[in-house]
UniProtKB/Swiss-Prot annotation:
The gene is mspTL. The keyword Membrane applies. Its main location: membrane. It comes from Treponema lecithinolyticum. This is Major surface protein MspTL. It is found in: Cell outer membrane.
């Protein structure tokens, strides 16, 4: 809190300097609250009870977000600073805290652009890795952009871990731009932070130098104390040389490292080239590639010792195209296609030279298209509200950092992994739909996600000794459902107006299916059906919503008929049933 107040004082004093840029203010942006009482019946236990809830929040804007840039023409330096809005929030169940999209109690000034312009040419002096294509987003009706989910949202080329240097570019606005990037790699050493004790279960796979038998051994990084080399504690794994598995549950110790000193003068370099052209309005085509030279100095023995630890010889490639075709006033067709490649060079100790494996590390083609009609003010779909953050296939457990608007329309997305025969086991397609204001009062959200590969199997590798080697169990069922290989969801609501009263019936259904193949065309399958429904009544009592609901209902079945992996098993079934909760609710909101 002291840091928050300190930042506020700094920006308050700077208010006269920043004009239309970030400015200090003290303004209440939101002040609201609600209280609710629910009477529910657990249909599984036939037990009843009340639940009281209160909520409230106040948001106080202390600093408007904004940016400030230098200007000029001819030969000039461009620097653009950005800062997020700075808001304090207090809730009924939480003390005052900082409310920004930044983690931790911190307000950061971001350097958005740093370039030296020479007419249409420029020299960029801001750090950045050579992973091209990060601004090619796949359109989606439900707009679930997660900041760390690059699978369903975007796919820039793989990072080569060279981010220091400069960029030489030439740009004609709205026509084209080309860039050549010269990057070097900094080396940040690691040093011991602390030693932690952990308990590892039987059959845990460990690597050399990862765990030690004593605190002293871990502290000193003693090779004689390495669990990996103790035949009494670990067994080798057939076909693997870099990992072994524990014979029994054991208490071991590990080294926790932290960053040490950083050396920027390493003689390690990489080169990248990127081009982007806009031949017609709203059409963008791009291509980019990078090559890692690695360490350039040193004799043969030095370079041999380095090997490919500096990513020497690696090649990355990106190409993509995006188009936004506007039809009439608010209809739009938005297709996007991207392809990324990464060739990972490996050091061949026998020949003492770099060589490329037969298979690429990455070879991925992705494409998506949206036919849409306008935008919505809502940030969550009804399907999201009913099913929750962790249940739906497209979301992760991290905070959503995407846009705060849904995109009415229908979208289709597909990903094609062209490495080896991966496409034979994993070929995801996803269709989504959001109605928006297509029909007044009607709100519909839907998704279909399926692995349509020829030999689709959500968990492609079965290891003897795991929950899959024997029969269908609760653990196997939950793992298969968690893989979310096939998911179909539908949610809908409709506003019924009766004079001053509004009745809003709503319901949602979500089917999730998982499957695992064994030998001789045998398989394990798991299915889960979730159903929820409610009716809200508004206007009978001022400022109050009356509801009747049925939620948390689910039925699931897992089966393994004549499942074969090593040995053949009889049919095994696992069932789960939740009748859910039925209840009445009254909520007063301000």
């Amino acid at each position: 809190m002291k840091k928050i107040l300190a930042f506020f004082l700094v920006f308050a004093l700077a208010g006269a300097v920043f004009a239309d840029e970030p400015s200090a203010e003290a303004k209440i942006a939101e002040f609201k609250g609600d209280a609710a009482v629910t009477f529910g019946v657990d249909l599984d236990t036939n037990r009843t009870g009340f639940k009281n809830e209160v909520g409230g929040s106040i948001k106080l804007n202390l600093l408007n977000g904004g940016d400030k840039s230098t200007t000029g023409d001819g030969i000039w330096g461009e620097l653009k600073l950005k800062i997020n809005a700075f808001t304090l929030q207090a809730k009924a169940d939480k003390n005052v805290n900082l409310l920004t999209k930044i983690d931790d109690d911190d307000v950061k000034v971001e350097i958005d652009t740093a370039k030296i312009h020479i007419g249409p040419a420029y020299v960029g002096i801001k750090k950045g890795d050579l992973n091209y294509g990060s601004n090619f987003w796949y359109p989606n009706a439900l707009n679930y952009k997660d900041g760390d989910d690059e699978y369903y949202n975007r796919t820039p080329s793989d990072k080569v871990k060279y981010d220091q240097g400069l960029v030489l570019g030439y740009e004609q606005k709205d026509l084209f731009k080309v860039e050549t990037a010269f990057r070097s790699q900094k080396d940040t050493g690691k040093k011991l932070d602390k030693v932690e004790g952990v308990i590892l279960p039987k059959d845990t796979e460990i690597k050399k130098g990862e765990y030690f038998k004593s605190v002293e051994g871990a502290h000193d990084n003693a090779k004689t104390d390495d669990v990996f080399d103790d035949a009494a504690l670990v067994d080798p794994i057939p076909g693997k040389t870099d990992v072994k598995k524990l014979k029994a549950t054991x208490a071991v110790f590990k080294r926790v490292m932290k960053d040490g000193d950083t050396n920027y003068w390493t003689d390690k370099y990489a080169l990248g080239v990127y081009g982007e052209v806009k031949p017609i309005k709203d059409l963008r085509v791009a291509i980019g590639t990078a090559y890692v030279f690695g360490r350039l100095s040193g004799d043969k023995d030095v370079l041999k010792a380095v090997g490919d630890s500096d990513n020497r010889g690696d090649i990355t490639f990106f190409t993509g195209a995006x188009y936004k075709l506007s039809l009439l006033e608010k209809f739009v067709v938005n297709p996007v296609v991207t392809y990324t490649l990464y060739a990972d060079a490996k050091w061949n100790g026998a020949n003492e030279k770099l060589x490329y494996p037969e298979x690429l590390k990455t070879s991925m083609l992705k494409t998506g298209v949206r036919f849409g009609w306008g935008e919505x003010k809502k940030s969550n779909s009804l399907l999201y509200d009913f099913x929750g953050k962790n249940t739906l296939v497209y979301d992760t457990n991290k905070e959503d950092k995407g846009d705060d608007k849904l995109l009415p329309g229908v979208s289709l997305f597909g990903a094609f992994d062209l490495v080896n025969k991966n496409i034979e086991t994993k070929l995801p397609l996803m269709x989504t739909f959001y109605s928006g204001e297509l029909v007044k009062g009607l709100n519909v959200a839907a998704l279909v996600h399926a692995n349509v590969a020829k030999d689709a199997s959500e968990i492609s590798r079965v290891v003897p000794g795991t929950v899959y080697a024997g029969r269908m169990t609760k653990a196997x069922y939950e793992r298969l459902i968690g893989a979310k290989g096939l998911q179909i969801g539908l949610a809908a609501s409709y506003d019924v107006k009766l004079n001053d009263i509004t009745i809003v019936p709503a319901a949602a259904m979500l089917w999730t299916h998982g499957m695992l193949k064994g030998e001789a065309d045998t398989r394990m399958t798991a299915d889960e059906f979730k159903v929820e429904a409610k009716v809200d009544v508004k206007g009978v009592i001022q400022n109050t919503t009356l509801s009747v609901f049925w939620d948390e209902a689910a039925f699931g079945k897992g089966t393994s008929k004549e499942w074969t992996f090593g040995v053949k098993h009889d049919e095994q079934n696992y069932y789960t049933l939740k009748n859910g909760v039925f209840g009445l609710k009254a909520k007063i909101a301000l």
